[in-house]
UniProtKB/Swiss-Prot annotation:
PANTHER family: GLUCOSE-6-PHOSPHATE ISOMERASE. Catalyzes the reversible isomerization of glucose-6-phosphate to fructose-6-phosphate. It comes from Wigglesworthia glossinidia brevipalpis. GO terms for cellular component: cytosol. This is Glucose-6-phosphate isomerase. It is found in: Cytoplasm. GO terms for molecular function: carbohydrate derivative binding; glucose-6-phosphate isomerase activity; monosaccharide binding. HAMAP family: G6P_isomerase. Keywords: Cytoplasm, Gluconeogenesis, Glycolysis, Isomerase.
Amino acid sequence: MKNINPTKTKSWNLLKKHFNNMKKVNIKDLFEKDKNRFSSFSICFDDIILIDYSKNIITKETIKKLIQLAKECDLNNAILSMFCGKKINYTENRAVLHTALRNHKNISIEIDGINIIPKIKKVLNKMKNFCSDLIDGNWKGFTGERITHIVNIGIGGSDLGPYMVTEALKFYKNHLNVYFVSNIDGTHITEILKYLSPKNTLFLIASKTFTTQETITNAYSAKDWFLKYAKDKKYLSRHFIALSSNIDEVKKFGINTENIFELWNWVGGRYSLWSCMGLSIALSIGFNNFEKLLRGAYAMDQHFLKQPFEKNIPIILGLISIWYNNFFNFETESILVYDQYMHLFSSYFQQVNMESNGKSIDRNGNLVNYQTGSILWGGYGTNSQHAFYQLMHQGTKIVPCDFIVPIISHNPVSDHHQKLLANFFAQTKALAFGKKSENNHIKLYKYDSNKIKILPFKILPGNRPTNSILIKEINPYNLGSLIAMYEHKIFTQGVVLNINSFDQWGVELGKQLSKKLFSILRKEKILNTSSYDSSTNGLINFYKLWKK
């Protein structure tokens, strides 16, 4: 990968000039000038996902210049470097190969001269056999009863990705009940375990390093809870599974080697749901459906790898985000999913996006002089309309949005889904085109001239950019494609912005400080003024006074 400061490229300077012509442009005017704008600015993927990006403050010239920027930043070679296993995560000297996890074509991919595909297939086969045994009732708990409850203990990528997918595909779930524990707050694990029985509960301890404080703390609490009932450690083998790359630490915990599903350091945590970290998904919906999830992601991988930039969905979406963040100074973007099953989707990609591209140091080790990752947030369904859409329609902050909705509902109750779709289409139309005073004058004067006073409050300026993403239905294959689409969008942004999207050094300091502070919190002694800064001292001392 080449390390190119995007602001030093010819394309960036051309985009700056182009922005001066575009900053006053209105989306409504763009549609009036081009009656076929939808056709010009929409892409259909495999007849399952439609991306309509026509309601953006862009022209064909904008897209042309953004694509030229991507080419100047050597995006094509960066994509090839990732897929073929080059160590593009240079700060950790690691390859980035979550794409290999869904490569079902048996095409060799090598790291340091070793083909990794056989290792992947071996773990997938082990997952398949385990899922079959447990779902069919052949894997029993220590009392001989069938396992009916699965508790995944992890955090970050070991939790939110599998949790999101399990919720999104709940329509496909079998008889197993899957729960997720992540927070180190004791309330989280307590509220889940209080309804479960040790005799039919299986724990998945999901931690690549098997040293993550939150996960290991919760894992030991789960172990204590289990042994309080089972009494003998020999029974752990029927109730504890490890998803990890640290075999030694897993053994220290007391989990048998045969109960370990292996992970590798070329799989980043936030991209790991495709690996053994997705065992909770496979147990919930069955391994065949998990394979369909992988196949859907693979299809999007091939689109990203092979389609020209002009028709490449992740690239187009990534470049439009850069356009808004760096030229319009729109600091946030939102994902709004009109599907109840998908209620965690925006939270998951908040993590993937902000942990990947929330960087201020470029790949050359220099402080950047431009914007990198956007603040990403979101919501789901019409609930969000009654929460924060007011700001999006009439506030002073412009928030580019992705609206996502399935065409086919799994629960077609009466006319609910048509009303949901009507709201979806209405919101993107209202955000783009608004409601001007001319439309209100006649109505207000006709009935009561005094009401003219409220006229300014009823104006919606419009010109709020959105992408409309229609997905035929939420099924494992389609969801896999959608997730991979966003993964590659984030990668595109990282390459063009010259940052490493696959490390997360910013989270380390807080972890280190918390370990030191934990030992202090266990002591009764009040801190003196020289121990830490006055704020930290004061907070700790109040804790010690009040906990009594």
